[in-house]
Amino acid sequence: MERESVCVLGGGSTKYGKLDDSISDITLQASVGAIESAGIEPKEIEAGYISNVFGVADKQVHLGPVVMSNLGISECPSLSIESACGSGSVSFREAFANVAAGFYDAVLVTGTEKVTHTGTDWTTTYFSYCSDFFYEGQAGASFPGLFASMARAYLNEFDATEEDLA
């Protein structure tokens, strides 16, 4: 399949905010919404790319096989993707590349996080584990802090304004 032939057929989401449902249920709800809006059946899905970083906070990691099983397609290959802030983008890229290469015609890409119940200290600490903890994390660097430092360096290097970044 040509890259130009790859498209997004549907999308799904849950409500935003503090949800009582488990991370597995939240992921399933969003996945079902995407499948329904695409106008396909779960059995038409040939692979799943499920992104999640903080599943451990809800006592559930390796969401790929869990989601596919809950959709009734446990035989469908899936990949659980954990790539910090880029998890959703990495999932989308992998799905796009595999469809464009002709490996699959229909795939599911879902990204889910649930950290409203963890507290800021836990979440910030866990996020620091996504970087090189012994080099950056122990120094107190966090992704928001690192992103801010890079933005500030860009502004200084190129004599840009905050509006230029917006």
What is the predicted function of each stretch?
Residues F96-T110, G119-W122:
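Hydrophobic or amphipathic alpha-helical targeting/insertion segments
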Residues M1-P77, T112-A166:
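Conserved "HGTGT" condensation-loop signature of ketosynthase/thiolase-family condensing enzymes
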Residues S5-C7, G12, S83, A97, ...:
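Short, flexible coil/turn micro-motifs enriched in small/turn-prone residues
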Residues I73-E94:
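Aromatic/His-enriched, Gly/Pro-containing loop or helix-boundary segments
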